[in-house]
Amino acid sequence: MPKSTDIKSILILGAGPIVIGQACEFDYSGAQACKALKEEGYKIILVNSNPATIMTDPCMADATYIEPIHWKIVKKIIQKEQPDALLPTMGGQTALNCALELNRRGILKKFNVKIIGATIDAINKAEDRKLFEDSMKKLNLKTAKCGIAHNIQEALLVLKNVGFPCIIRPSFTMGGHGGGIAYNQEEFEDICERGLKLSPTTELLIDESLIGWKEYEMEVVRDKNNNCIIVCSIENLDPMGIHTGDSITIAPAQTLSDKEYQIMRNASMSILREIGVETGGSNVQFAINPKNGRMIVIEMNPRVSRSSALASKATGFPIAKIAAKLAVGYTLDELANDITGINTTASFEPSIDYIVTKIPRFNFEKFLGCNDRLTTQMKSVGEVMAIGRTFQESIQKAICGLEIGSSGFDSKVSFADNKQDIIKIRHELKDAGAERIWYIGDAFRCGMSVNDVFELTSIDPWFLVQIQEIIQLEKKIIQKGFIGLDYNFFYFIKRKGFSDLRIAILTNKKEEEIRQLRYELNLHPVYKRIDTCSAEFSTETAYMYSTWEDECESHPTKNTKKIIVIGGGPNRIGQGIEFDYCCVHAAQALREDGFEAIMINCNPETVSTDYDISDRLYFEPITLENVLEIVRIENPKGVIIQYGGQTPLKLARQFEKEGIPIIGTNPDAIDKAEDRNRFQKIVTKLKLKQPLNATVLTLEEAHKKAIEIGYPIMVRPSYVLGGRAMEIVYEPCDLDNYFKKFLKNNHITPILLDQYLNYAIEVDVDAICDGEKVLIGGIMEHIEQAGVHSGDSACSLPAYTLTNKIQNKIREQVKKLAFALSVKGLMNVQFAIKNNEIYIIEVNPRAARTVPFVSKATGLALAKISVRVMYGKTLSEQGFCKEVIPSYFSVKEAVLPFDKFQGVDPILGPEMRSTGEVMGIGKNFSEAFSKAMLGSHTNMKKSGRVLLSVRDDDKNSIVNLAVKLQKFGFKIDATKGTSIALKKSGIMARLVNKVHEGRPHIQDRLKNGEYSYIVNTTSCHQGMKDSQLICRSALQYKVHYDTTVNGAFATVMALNEEPTENIISLQEIHKKINLIN
């Protein structure tokens, strides 16, 4: 059957900001859906609040709304655009929940909007735990012994039947949010209480414990004619009890018998039919008891998911694209397989002759004091995928791609004290953390058996034997040494996945020496293609991975206009989707201009690793070894390293040494900006200002320089991204503590000390330089004052308080710096403004995380303009010489994951901790900020009682804030010091006790629901513990809080606006742009 003709326009719901449990895999799926449906001639209307996504590029839809995904706003968009259909299956749990709310309120029926991709009944049957259990009973499929609860009393009744330990899962949440494993009554009540608050339907599923069972997933696609295919089977290496998003996963499943696989396959298809998923992709999860083979169904997602993205990249089968086309009436046999072309259709199940391994990436070091043990609530912030012919090759490649400084199965213990080492290893195996896979290696080094490790981990012995063999091989490499690396042995260990760097460490040599020997032996990898059919049919799509065999399928073209774009690797805090956005734009611009674009990346969640974004895709870890091999075979004109964040940048000098041409700003210019002494000379020569600063290597030097600069000071290591290990130090003892931590973590780079400019306004500027002219992309004013990391601070474009005079001075300084640093391409400059003086904080001659936001706010595709500059097309030739000053305001707001990490200090500081961002667009700053707050799920009420508790430095400012709050009708509470300051100005506030001052105290009042807003600022050690406790409690009870006075004033300004009142598409606002000379 052909596509549906009764539908002319389709509204697609995005997933909103990147959060733990819902990351950029939904940009990948949403972008695929937009492209697929647009090429079919449908009018596409898109709603998504995340500006860092490819799907929100104006070219992807006919009407793009960067608006909060809230039912009131979506209702207004439906009223305005009159879509015929709504596609909610591409935006994760956020989109599904919004669709359900629109249906519940009768909005879809009122405006005659048809849901496609999944019916409301199907969503409810899959998401509602009771309905799902009933559906499984109809199919005679077992589910875990469980019960449903809507309050604590019901939960306790369920507990009597289920017993301890038990697993608690809130309904309609993502990433296991709010859930957990309870081993006792206290834990049970605590998790249930939290879960009930987080479930939109106030519903919990309480399961019997399946800890230690094996976990599997099936990616299923079904069409309207009841044709079903299994795209991919996925096996979790980690057993049940660890969220699948935090598990190492393998595709295809390795330890299922054929009989088990067929039972699971048939069950998956039956589940889709029973639930009512008429078209599209779904993910079905199973558990098998390894002791008796009992199989149960865990859950299913009636939408594309994190696993769908992994399965798509693992097989080459574009699940989201196919699901979108099935949603409008096509059947699987009518859709061509893009990779094999006319040879096969989408009804052919993919067949793969390789092993794919996904390893999650964690950022626990950003959240000191958090529980870093892995449970049923997801905690990872990204992931890496690797492809090899064997599991051993695949997992070792994946480890190298993690960007954590690991070359393979590095040891985590010193082996200096064998007894203590074994105690540590046993603990890490039993109570899994982010590094368990390395401790398994150490367990085998200590002489533990496969059975010993299995008893502690419940990981299938097949995987353990594979890892044990790798450790045995390591011992053999050490025994043979460098001189024992003959051709046969070298080739053998490369086939097992050993990197040059790992071999170098084991033989006590430099990586360069190992590489040189390998070259002398003429040992190089070959490249195989991902083709969906195990090489049964030929393919023109160059989607490749490296392995160690005889035949190479890379077949590089003879095109002399080749440029390699190096991606950013796995998402982590400080380096996220924004850099992938830039890489995608680079590939698009190159292809538009007749270049052959070659992408290297290893992140399965991203758009850049879609096989049709570049001409050639190498799915490889971003290491020197891998890039050199690809350069050797492709012989490109050059490589682009400025778009993938710190990952490719740190290889710049080595690329230069190896003679690889770098497109754009050269490594020396990058070093000039990064090297403190070199940069200071440039600033001095240009007669510009910097905060007083110094570079030190020892604690003694640091104390001496700190006295010269004057406390407080900002302390950080050189060459880091995301403010890693950055702190504000107020006194000498803080400096001592910082160095203790720093040395403990084995940092060896120089330490940078900067004067901390208290109450300064921070400013970000994105610009492009072609060597002759500088294009100012945008001047962004931060809402939180300097001292809060730029990635965690909200910002406004255009600036909302800076004078034109200051902004013009900033423009001039950016231009001077661009020319002095010989920038060719993008650059980002950060300033601090204090008492009308401009101080340069830092310059980054590369793409910054603000590029997507500025591009959406101004209509200028900065990454594309810059890439063309980098390969020689001037700004004048492109027609971009004028800065764009929008007539509307755009605000970028950070989204923080503190609700996932209980017990963590939630006060913002110089180290970045946000996982994502949203954008609000409005006629003025207030409206834009109110939308950004709504998009980031800020629960800000417009009335009630406010708690004010601020540091001494803020007491003058707080009076004005209190006056404004009273005008809105808020009642004021204040702690003792703040109350005195308010009283002096004639403002009466109810005095409230801090926790240590007696009851009723702040926590009591929060628990009683007395507060709707909290302003709490602190400095040094003054009230630090109190402040942390206040903010943690505010998070727990869903009360909005600000930890800076500037942030509080912006919040009050936003109260003047109704964020759901006005909507406008990106296409409409870009027509209103004004240009200035």
From Swiss-Prot:
Stretch forming the signal peptide: none
Location of the MGS-like domain: 938-1077
Domain ATP-grasp: 133-328, 680-871
Protein residues bound to Mg(2+) 4: 842, 844
Binding site for Mg(2+) 2: 299, 301
Any single Gene Ontology cellular-component annotation: cytoplasm
Residues that bind ATP 2: 716, 755, 757, 762, 787-790, 830, 842
Binding site for Mn(2+) 3: 830, 842
Region (Oligomerization domain): 404-554
Residues at which Mn(2+) 4 binds: 842, 844
GO-annotated biological processes: 'de novo' UMP biosynthetic process; glutamine metabolic process; L-arginine biosynthetic process
Entry's cofactor comment: Binds 4 Mg(2+) or Mn(2+) ions per subunit.
UniProt binding sites for Mg(2+) 3: 830, 842
Stretches the record annotates as Carboxyphosphate synthetic domain: 2-403
Pathway assigned in UniProt: Amino-acid biosynthesis; L-arginine biosynthesis; carbamoyl phosphate from bicarbonate: step 1/1; Pyrimidine metabolism; UMP biosynthesis via de novo pathway; (S)-dihydroorotate from bicarbonate: step 1/3
Cited function: Large subunit of the glutamine-dependent carbamoyl phosphate synthetase (CPSase). CPSase catalyzes the formation of carbamoyl phosphate from the ammonia moiety of glutamine, carbonate, and phosphate donated by ATP, constituting the first step of 2 biosynthetic pathways, one leading to arginine and/or urea and the other to pyrimidine nucleotides.
Name this polypeptide is given: Carbamoyl phosphate synthase large chain
Gene (UniProt): carB
